[in-house]
């Protein structure tokens, strides 16, 4: 069944309610998807894109119900991926001489998938036009790496419709086609999920390409995407969102993600979150167990966040496999303007947190101090986790902290100073254990109230057994 998009433009695509995996299993399409193909009937008849290859026969049969296939004058392929051009082999078997208009890179991709170099390919570049009669033209705009090298958009003059390919789309299936007909909350969530998981690596290209398209000074009454809705009500709203998301986007949000073997790292995650919320009640904190959560939801939250804390147990001296996989995904997505911190629990060896810190730094995150706990964290260890969360909240604050929080901190510091000027707390640079002069270290006969300067030179860190020379003044107390 076709749907009128505008005037002589009809949607002839395919809804896919049951699809749950995309790009292999890398993208969970929890709300299905659609493969949008468009038939333009002017003096010349034009088909823009096809559908996913698994619907090839249905697509060609449905298209026959709309038009004699021999009457299709041109085929435009904006993108050669199988969910866009998958039905070409089935269609071209019926009309083998029909001209195909696409980019030079698309020819390589189409031949790689369909193996028909004899098809009638016509290469187009940015600014090229194709007259389709009735005073209307198609204008082509190359958009390489949004998100494949072959990608392009097509603009129809007269009707002012931009066929935008993957840009501005979403994996979202609904019986309604237009953006003003569907649930707006669901639509926004799927748009952001789509951008975060698919287009984030190419954010540096989004703004200049949108600027280039706007530079044509062409009116845009509708944006017809390759997946999801057609934007007819205020279509530029999604363009404005893309410009916002492309500009090193972040919200006042922190994501905590972890995997755990014996629940110990989960306990750390909860305590860190408590410390963050206690110090900065305005910040949104979301916690995910990577083994039990939707990976794409996690990555969308990282995209939205100003920072991410990643936790892992140590297994065979390395991080948990699902955490390693998630960090590899984050490396590929090339997030920008975000901070990170690693944490985790261990038994006899704690190598995972160090490896995790290195991997996060390699992924482009600005790193903060990491945190380790040995075995199951006791109340003292959990308090260290809360303090770590408090320090993260202070370091990552986007604005001055609420006055009530500041006053509490000042009062505590004033009270401590009144009791005795014990000097700063010191942190082991290897394992992050903290020496608090107010508590001392009774196990080594260091009495409460002992400043660091008076701690014996033979003092050893209770966690890693290294000496005083590896201790530094706690960052939050450094002047």
Curated annotation (Swiss-Prot):
Residues 254-393 form the Flavodoxin-like domain. Residues 423-474 form the Rubredoxin-like domain. GO terms for molecular function: electron transfer activity; FMN binding; iron ion binding; nitric oxide reductase activity. Binds 3 Fe cations per monomer. Binds 1 FMN per monomer. InterPro entries: Anaer_NO_rdtase_flvorubredoxin, Flavodoxin/NO_synth, Flavoprotein-like_sf, Metallo-B-lactamas, ODP_dom, RibonucZ/Hydroxyglut_hydro, Rubredoxin-like_dom, Rubredoxin-O_OxRdtase. Fe cation 2 binds at residues 83, 166, 227. One of its GO terms (cellular component) is cytoplasm. Signal peptide: none annotated. Keywords: Cytoplasm, Electron transport, Flavoprotein, FMN, Iron, Metal-binding, Oxidoreductase, Transport. Residues 30-210 are annotated as: Zinc metallo-hydrolase. Pathway: Nitrogen metabolism; nitric oxide reduction. Pfam families: Flavodoxin_1, ODP, Rubredoxin. Fe cation 3 binds at residues 428, 431, 461, 464. Its cofactor is Fe cation; FMN. FMN binds at residues 260-264, 342-369. Fe cation 1 binds at residues 79, 81, 147, 166. It is found in: Cytoplasm. In the N-terminal section; belongs to the zinc metallo-hydrolase group 3 family. Anaerobic nitric oxide reductase; uses NADH to detoxify nitric oxide (NO), protecting several 4Fe-4S NO-sensitive enzymes. Has at least 2 reductase partners, only one of which (NorW, flavorubredoxin reductase) has been identified. NO probably binds to the di-iron center; electrons enter from the NorW at rubredoxin and are transferred sequentially to the FMN center and the di-iron center. Also able to function as an aerobic oxygen reductase. Homotetramer. NCBIfam families: PRK05452.1. This is Anaerobic nitric oxide reductase flavorubredoxin. It comes from Escherichia coli O1:K1 / APEC. The gene is norV.
């Amino acid at each position: 069944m076709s749907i009128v998009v505008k005037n002589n433009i009809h949607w002839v695509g395919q809804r896919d309610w049951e699809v749950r995996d995309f790009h292999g299993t890398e993208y969970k399409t929890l709300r299905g998807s659609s493969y949008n193909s468009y038939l333009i009937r002017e003096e010349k008849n034009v088909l823009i894109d096809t559908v996913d290859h698994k619907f090839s026969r249905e697509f060609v049969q449905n298209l026959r119900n709309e038009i004699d296939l021999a009457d299709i004058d041109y085929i435009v392929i904006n993108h050669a991926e199988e969910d866009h051009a998958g039905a070409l082999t089935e269609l071209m078997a019926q009309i083998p001489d029909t001209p195909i208009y696409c980019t030079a890179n698309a020819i390589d991709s189409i031949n790689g998938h369909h193996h028909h170099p004899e098809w009638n390919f016509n290469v187009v570049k940015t600014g090229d036009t194709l007259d389709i009669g009735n005073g209307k033209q198609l204008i082509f705009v190359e958009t390489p790496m949004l998100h494949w090298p072959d990608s392009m958009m097509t603009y129809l003059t007269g009707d002012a419709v931009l066929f935008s390919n993957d840009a501005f789309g979403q994996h979202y299936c609904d019986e309604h086609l237009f953006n003003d007909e569907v649930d707006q909350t669901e639509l926004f969530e799927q748009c952001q999920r789509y951008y975060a998981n698919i287009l984030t690596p190419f954010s540096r290209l989004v703004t200049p390409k949108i600027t280039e398209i706007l530079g044509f000074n062409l009116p845009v009454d509708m944006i017809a995407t390759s997946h999801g809705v057609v934007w007819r009500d205020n279509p530029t709203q999604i363009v404005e969102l893309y410009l916002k998301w492309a500009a090193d986007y972040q919200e006042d949000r922190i994501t905590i993600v972890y995997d755990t073997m014996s629940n110990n790292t989960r306990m750390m995650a909860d305590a860190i979150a408590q410390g963050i919320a206690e110090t900065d009640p305005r910040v949104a904190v979301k916690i995910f167990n990577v083994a039990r959560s939707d990976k794409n939801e996690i990555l969308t939250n990282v995209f939205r966040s100003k920072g991410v804390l990643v936790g892992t147990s140590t297994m065979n001296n390395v991080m948990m496999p699902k955490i390693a996989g998630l960090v590899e995904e984050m490396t590929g997505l090339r997030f920008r303007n975000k901070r990170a911190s690693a944490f985790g629990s261990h038994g006899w060896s704690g190598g995972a947190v160090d490896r995790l810190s290195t991997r996060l730094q390699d992924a482009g995150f600005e790193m903060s101090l990491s945190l380790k706990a040995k075995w199951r964290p006791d109340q003292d260890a959990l308090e260290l986790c809360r303090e770590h969360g408090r320090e993260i909240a202070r370091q990552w604050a986007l604005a001055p902290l609420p006055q009530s929080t500041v006053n509490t901190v000042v009062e505590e510091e004033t009270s401590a100073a009144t009791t005795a000027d014990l000097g700063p707390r010191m942190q082991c640079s290897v394992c992050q254990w903290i020496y608090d002069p107010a508590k001392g270290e009774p196990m080594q006969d260091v009495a409460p109230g002992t400043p660091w300067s008076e701690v014996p030179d033979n003092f050893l860190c209770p966690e890693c057994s290294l000496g005083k020379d590896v201790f530094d003044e706690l960052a939050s107390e450094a002047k």
